Structures are given as structure tokens and as C-alpha cells.
Design a protein with these regions (language model features):
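An extended, acidic, His-containing surface patch that forms the Zn2+-binding/catalytic region
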Residues: 115-170
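Midchain, well-structured core segments that form catalytic/ion-binding scaffolds
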Residues: 1-125, 153-154
């Protein structure tokens, strides 16, 4: 395969929720539950409307919270990624994700801080590069077929940042 058209743009981030611990039996009203805020945010993230211009994804891959069974949780962590078929679509999902997270924090009276952990751009291969790879593959003994490109989902890849820089200098 000489080219793939479906590297999605992606943004990876953590959301740290900070509430107030309280004894869950004696004084639950003194607590501000970071776990519930993170759970509400998770549900809201997975309810983000799709974009009309292409595919999008959001995933909460990790949720950690609490310190004990009789304590209103004072902290919670979500590890989240957004994806989009284009940089614009990914930005749409990311922006909506930030709104959902802030809304959940406000709803439960807790603080939240998000921290960017990584990103990659959407990418398609250069037609000239694909043609060159195909011509080179045809010269290799044992290669029976060099497929021009695949349109199956390719996920997201850090290498797309390098690909974009190379394409800028062609």
C-alpha cells in the first residue's frame, strides 16, 4: 500500500477535577463530588453531536477518582482523545468537549483543569509520492502488486505532523 487517505486529526488531553472531600455518612453536604462531575462529563463527551462534514470520534479511555468508600471524592482524572476527519472537525469536537467538561464541573461545584497531552493533524499522501512509491515497488522482486491507496480508516498518527512539514516544502 503506497498511500492512505484517512489519517484523522487528534487531540489528547487530561481533565483534572478538584472538589472537596467530606465524610459520606456524617457530612455528605460538605463535599463537592469530583467523581460525579467526571462521570457527568464522560456521558456528555460521548453525546457530542457528529459533524456534517465528516467523521469524528471522542473517547474517554481512563477515569480515576476517589480515595475511599466512605469519602466524597475530592479528585478525579479523565484521559480523553478527540478525532476528526479534518483539523476543523477535530477542533469542533475538542471545543465541544471543553464545554462539556466545564459544564459538568460547574454542575457539581468543582474545579477543573485540562492539560494538552498530544496532537496530530489530519493527512493525505501526496499523489506524486504515491506514484513514485508504486513505481519503486514494481521494481522489487517478489512484489506482485503495489496498491495505490487505501481508504479504510487509518486512525491517527503522530507521523502526520512530519508528513505535513514535508508536503509544505515540496
Amino acid at each position: 500500500v503506497c498511500g492512505s487517505d484517512n489519517f484523522m486529526a487528534t487531540t489528547k488531553f487530561d481533565a483534572h477535577f478538584t472538589g472537596t472531600a467530606a465524610h459520606a455518612g456524617a457530612k455528605p453536604e460538605d463535599g463537592h463530588n469530583a467523581l460525579l462531575a467526571a462521570a457527568q462529563a464522560t456521558l456528555a463527551l460521548h453525546a457530542i453531536a457528529p459533524h456534517s462534514e465528516g467523521a469524528s470520534r471522542v473517547n474517554v479511555g481512563v477515569m480515576q477518582a476517589g480515595s475511599g468508600r466512605n469519602v466524597v471524592p475530592a479528585s478525579a482524572l479523565l484521559k480523553v482523545e478527540t478525532r476528526g476527519a479534518s483539523d476543523v472537525i477535530n477542533q469542533y469536537v475538542f471545543d465541544r468537549a471543553q464545554q462539556a467538561i466545564q459544564g459538568a464541573a460547574t454542575m457539581y461545584g468543582v474545579g477543573v483543569e485540562t492539560r494538552l497531552m498530544g496532537a496530530a493533524t489530519a493527512s493525505s499522501p501526496s499523489p506524486q509520492w504515491v506514484a513514485w512509491l508504486q513505481s519503486q515497488a514494481a521494481q522489487v522482486a517478489g512484489v506482485n502488486q503495489a496498491i495505490e491507496r487505501v481508504e479504510a480508516p487509518a486512525g491517527s498518527e503522530d507521523a502526520t505532523l512530519m508528513m505535513a512539514r514535508v508536503q509544505q516544502h515540496q
